[in-house]
UniProtKB/Swiss-Prot annotation:
<protein>
    <recommendedName>
        <fullName>Lysine--tRNA ligase</fullName>
        <ecNumber>6.1.1.6</ecNumber>
    </recommendedName>
</protein>
<keyword id="KW-0963">Cytoplasm</keyword>
<dbReference type="GO" id="GO:0000049">
    <property type="term" value="F:tRNA binding"/>
</dbReference>
<dbReference type="GO" id="GO:0005737">
    <property type="term" value="C:cytoplasm"/>
</dbReference>
<keyword id="KW-0547">Nucleotide-binding</keyword>
<dbReference type="InterPro" id="IPR002904">
    <property type="entry name" value="Lys-tRNA-ligase"/>
</dbReference>
<keyword id="KW-0436">Ligase</keyword>
<keyword id="KW-0648">Protein biosynthesis</keyword>
<dbReference type="GO" id="GO:0006430">
    <property type="term" value="P:lysyl-tRNA aminoacylation"/>
</dbReference>
<dbReference type="GO" id="GO:0004824">
    <property type="term" value="F:lysine-tRNA ligase activity"/>
</dbReference>
<dbReference type="GO" id="GO:0005524">
    <property type="term" value="F:ATP binding"/>
</dbReference>
<dbReference type="InterPro" id="IPR020751">
    <property type="entry name" value="aa-tRNA-synth_I_codon-bd_sub2"/>
</dbReference>
<keyword id="KW-0067">ATP-binding</keyword>
<dbReference type="InterPro" id="IPR008925">
    <property type="entry name" value="aa_tRNA-synth_I_cd-bd_sf"/>
</dbReference>
<keyword id="KW-0030">Aminoacyl-tRNA synthetase</keyword>
<feature type="short sequence motif" description="'HIGH' region">
    <location>
        <begin position="44"/>
        <end position="52"/>
    </location>
</feature>
<comment type="similarity">
    <text>Belongs to the class-I aminoacyl-tRNA synthetase family.</text>
</comment>
């Protein structure tokens, strides 16, 4: 056994902990199907949101961890529930009123409001796949519509008809009395209107593989359960899909957790072993509300990628999946800088430490070196004091700090400068509020200015930080009040960088001029 595999078998990183649970399923015999199957499900009722991406990213991390501890082949399936009826019209699509007449039709039978695909479901599936492809995920996409219509689900549907009473008994226990009267695990699709019907069954004929029911307008109908004429209610569908595909691992949000025993029982009734599952906490927007596909709150994948790299988003997804996290624009700079801190740490770590480092899981063990010369938060401060409209303005500061660097030989730094200018103009600039210095703060700022004016030492972060400390230590206890003053008076922000590093990048004499402008009240007019 290699050193890496040995370390992986005891690693406390959560993807390895999950991978070991999956491996335990096959400690006696390998899977009959010849591979271990990881699955993620996607409900394409609205535009794909960042939580959807997170599920695939995290599942991929578990699959990659499994590959490190086992030689059994793996597959990752992304399954889209696009045969679901459209229950309500999403608010974040063009011409929503035009979709009203298509309520209750499968999403793949609803016209695409964007006018680019054969259906709304196809549009949203394409959006999801584009996002996943951007991140280089290796996955197989399965459409529920295709899965049902091409007969791939037929064997399980016929088994569900044969086990109808058993599955119904599981479901009825979970329903309120009034719902029990009309509930059926089978949802017929009206042959003419195309609508998914929620009607009780008059007969389920397992031998013939048919169901008989009265349609919503009172007409008695008999349909085969096979070939896409009928779909399963979503809870039975969950367990049935596990059985049909032989799923070994699936993760889903906390909102599904109470249904897990139902999914498991149905999978067993249909003759298969349920998968290992992992429940993650939900993402919240800045107001603490759950991010939802249909309302479009929170940060979209495209929005994150407007302001930061794909790796920073993967880093955010790795962190504490069982803790509810607010996901809004303010978290982006922290995610970028922490990701690069972990990259820099990785080079000096031993095997066990590397396997516990988030970047191992983000990059699947093939971890690059960080070439982020200047932290993202520092770039934002430089953009702030220079009112940067273009990344070339930031490169002037970057090259002062690292003369050998340029956009051509450091494309990652170039991209970060571009992201920082965008982020500054969209989020920092509108919120900038400068304030005047108090008498004590003015005295300290004048002292700092005078010491910087007279400074003829090296442009070194630590040397300059010592001057900043000295000016504050004589006057402020705790020292935090001094740094808060620097940020609020000079940068118009509530927090900021290590100030010595800021001076080194921005320039000593430029910082002197900035202090003079602040003390003269010139920055207050920007408010």
């Amino acid at each position: 056994m290699s050193d890496t595999r040995t370390a992986a078998m005891t690693s406390k990183a959560w993807p390895f902990e999950e991978a070991r649970r999956v491996l335990k399923r096959y400690e006696k015999n390998p899977p009959e199907k010849g591979y271990v199957l990881f699955e993620t499900g996607y409900g394409p009722s609205g535009l794909p949101h960042i939580g959807t991406f997170g599920e695939v990213a995290r599942t991929s991390m578990v699959m990659r961890a499994f590959q490190e501890i086992s030689d059994i082949p793996t597959r990752l399936i992304c399954f889209s529930d696009d045969l679901d009826g459209m229950r309500k019209v999403p608010g974040n699509v063009p011409n929503p009123d035009a979709l009203t007449e298509h309520l209750q039709r499968p999403l793949t039978s609803v016209p695409d409001p964007f006018g680019t695909h054969a259906s709304f479901g196809a549009h949203n599936n394409a959006m999801l796949r584009r996002f996943l492809d951007t991140f280089g995920f290796e996955y197989e996409f399965i459409s529920a519509t295709e899965f049902y219509n091409t007969g791939q689900f037929d064997e399980i549907l016929l088994r569900a008809a044969a086990k109808y009473d058993e599955i119904m008994a599981v479901m009825l226990k979970s329903l309120r009395e009034e719902r029990r009267q009309t509930y059926s695990i089978f949802l017929p699709i009206h042959p003419e209107s195309g609508r998914v019907m929620y009607v009780p069954m008059k007969e389920v004929n397992a031998q013939a593989g048919t169901i008989t029911f009265d349609s919503e307008d009172g007409e008695e109908m008999t349909l085969p359960v096979t070939g896409g004429a009928v779909k399963l209610q979503w809870k039975p569908d969950f367990g049935a899909r596990w059985a049909a595909l032989g799923v070994d691992f699936e993760m889903y949000g906390k909102d599904h957790s109470t249904n897990t025993p139902i999914y498991d029982k149905i999978c067993r009734i249909l003759g298969q072993r349920p998968p290992e599952h992992f429940t993650y906490e939900l993402f919240l927007d800045e107001n603490g509300q759950k991010i939802s596909k249909s309302s479009g709150n929170g940060v979209s994948i495209d929005e994150w990628l407007t302001y930061a790299s794909t790796e920073s988003l993967s880093y955010f997804m790795y962190q504490k999946p069982k803790t509810a996290k607010r996901m809004y624009f303010d978290v982006i700079p922290k995610a970028v800088d922490e990701y690069h801190q972990q990259l820099r740490a990785y080079a000096g770590q031993d095997t066990a430490q590397r396997l516990n480092n988030p970047v191992w899981h983000i990059h699947g063990g093939d971890v690059p070196a960080s070439n982020m010369l200047v932290p993202f938060s520092m770039l934002l401060n430089l953009a702030s004091v220079s009112s940067a409209e273009d990344k070339s303005q930031l490169w002037g500061f970057i090259q002062r700090y690292a003369p050998e660097s340029n956009p051509e030989n450091n494309p990652d730094m170039d991209a970060a400068a571009d992201f920082a200018v965008r982020y500054f103009n969209d989020f920092v600039k509108p919120k900038k509020v400068y304030r005047a210095a108090s008498d004590l703060e003015r005295e300290a700022l004048e002292d700092l200015r005078d010491q910087l004016k007279a400074y003829d030492g090296p442009v070194d972060d630590e040397a300059l930080q010592s001057i900043v400390y000295a000016c504050g230590r004589e006057r402020f206890d705790p020292l935090r009040g001094w740094f808060t003053a620097l940020y609020e008076v000079l940068l118009g922000a509530s927090q900021g960088p290590r100030f010595g590093g800021f001076i080194a990048l921005y320039g000593v004499q430029e910082t002197v001029a900035l202090i003079d402008a602040a003390l003269a009240g010139e920055l207050l007019s920007d408010d």
